[in-house]
Amino acid sequence: MLSLLSSEIFFSAIQYNLSLMEEVRLKKLQELREKGINPYPYRFEVTDFIGNIRKQYEEEPPENYKVRVKGVAKRVSRTENGYMVRLADEKGIEILVFTKEEGLKPKESYTFEGILKRVEGKLSLVEAVLTEEEGEEVYKIKEQFDYDPNFRPVSLAGRLVSMRSMGKAIFGHIQDLTGKIQIYLKKDVIGEEKLKFFNDYIDVGDIVGVRGKLFRTNTGELTVEVEEYQLLAKSLHPLPEKWHGLKDVEVRYRQRYLDLIANPEARRIFMLRTKLITEMRKFFEMHGFIEVETPILQPIASGANARPFVTYHNFLETELYLRIAPELYLKRLIVGGFPRVYEIGKNFRNESVDRTHNPEFTMVEFYAAYWDYHDLIKFTEDMFVYLLEKTLGTLKVKYGEWELDFSPPFKKVRYFDLLKEKTGKDKDFFLKDLEGLRKLAKELEIPDVERMTHAKLLDKVFEKVAEEDLIQPTFVIDFPKILSPLAKTHREDPDLVERFELIIARYEVANAYTELNDPFDQKERFLEQLKEKQMGDEEAMDMDEDFIRALEYGMPPTAGEGIGIDRLVMILANTDSIREVILFPQLKPEKKKKEAP
């Protein structure tokens, strides 16, 4: 049927060690070109996204909506948890029934009672049991929730993810980011030649455009009866095996495009992330915040305690740093008269990679003049309530084995109260007994304690003993000053600062404080950071003279906060790896495969 490979294509197939399936696809591509058909055309008119079409015609039944349905079992098949019955009424309209009842036979009449819900987009009866009570006809049930599309014309495009030929007809499914829909190509509608062309040259994985009319099959599945189609992009590689999807984690992260094609869960996570950021922007706008942009290439590594990435500007002949945090630039804007500002963007920290850390990550930082950290606590609670209601529709979130409750007010606990509860030791021990603290760190099996500064030791001990039991959203408040060089001294205790971290499911999700706006105090804190750096703390901040100068012009009382968007999405999406919520996470260089001798 297909012509032989040209020498050029054949050489390419050998060079890249293509599979037999890939060679066949390459042959098809060559033949399409020989026929004068462009396998990669310029455009296609799309009238709507698939998800919008499905949403319009497939209303979800109310939760736990019970019905009784009668009909004849056209087919009975076993599932993992029981049986699936195709139940049809006198009009031939079908519904899927999922049940654990034994002894069911095709062509027998049954009445089932169960919960009406959609399974893979199809209106179905689940948790169904046989009953002697009178049931309704299937079509009467479907009339309530499966609206008749009345052969509405549509023009849709997507990736072909399934296909089966039945002689005079072809069924398949196309998928875009918003959903999947069945397509139906019929010889009597498109003609024998076009049906044969689709069967011969279109493969699962290809991107196709279809024009036709919507209708429902007897099972109630929303379907496009295709009148015209067009190949929009030929896929030279087969998709991952249908029933198992793409399971290789390394491949999923390196080839995220393939992950998004094959795994509905990956698409769900990144749509959730997009929705979260969209709603976050709306929330800030509602509260009078202005979105701004600050430099990513910065002359001084400051704004947070972290090791920076270093680069070199050839023209300026100077070292620059990828930003650790936008904090000092955002506070300069407060000095300049911007009352409330926020920025959503990338930060970079040249540190370890693990399930909660990626060197390149996304944060939102925001600052409000005339607020203190008490105002931020209330604002943060309100923001989280808003975001969860808009993205998930609930304040209770399943995360691993826990159910997290975001109903305000969140729990609050003081930093040193938590340490005392866990260790029995008070604030003076942690701030004044350095050798005792070092001994405790050794007992906790914290590595490299001899090389750590006082601040680093305290931070590591807190992480080890205090965060383990912080599952529900909890504000840890009133941090030690030695850990917080940019925060304002606590108004009641000079050893502390007015700072909080929001811990959820053991993760630090937010960090905030009443901002230090005294230029003399700030300079002293920077000098202390320089001492820490000289003692070996590579994450200590550098002096920023221009920021001091900005404070000298006067910064009003201000509170600021940073929220890690990646970790927040991890929690809302119920995943335990930050790589699952970053489209293209940082990975080790891919090992090149050895060429065959």
Swiss-Prot record:
Q: Main EC class of this protein?
A: ligase
Question: Which residues take part in binding Mg(2+) 1?
Answer: E501, E508
- Comment on bound cofactor: Binds 3 Mg(2+) ions per subunit.
InterPro entries in UniProt: Aa-tRNA-synt_II, aa-tRNA-synth_II, aa-tRNA-synth_II/BPL/LPL, Lys-tRNA-ligase_II, Lys-tRNA-ligase_II_bac/euk, Lys-tRNA-ligase_II_N, Lys-tRNA-synth_II_C, NA-bd_OB-fold
GO biological processes: lysyl-tRNA aminoacylation
Q: Assembly state and interactors?
A: Homodimer.
* Protein name per UniProt: Lysine--tRNA ligase
List UniProt keywords, sorted A-Z: Aminoacyl-tRNA synthetase, ATP-binding, Cytoplasm, Ligase, Magnesium, Metal-binding, Nucleotide-binding, Protein biosynthesis
Q: Which organism does this record belong to?
A: Aquifex aeolicus (strain VF5)
Q: Where does Mg(2+) 2 bind?
A: E508
Residues of the signal peptide:
none
Location in the cell: Cytoplasm
Q: Which GO terms describe its cellular component?
A: cytoplasm; cytosol
Q: Which CDD domains match?
A: LysRS_core, LysRS_N
Recorded family membership: Belongs to the class-II aminoacyl-tRNA synthetase family.
What is the gene called?
A: lysS
Reaction(s) catalysed by this chain, per the record, are: tRNA(Lys) + L-lysine + ATP = L-lysyl-tRNA(Lys) + AMP + diphosphate
Write down the EC number.
6.1.1.6
Name what cofactor the protein needs.
Answer: Mg(2+)
- GO terms of molecular function: ATP binding; lysine-tRNA ligase activity; magnesium ion binding; tRNA binding
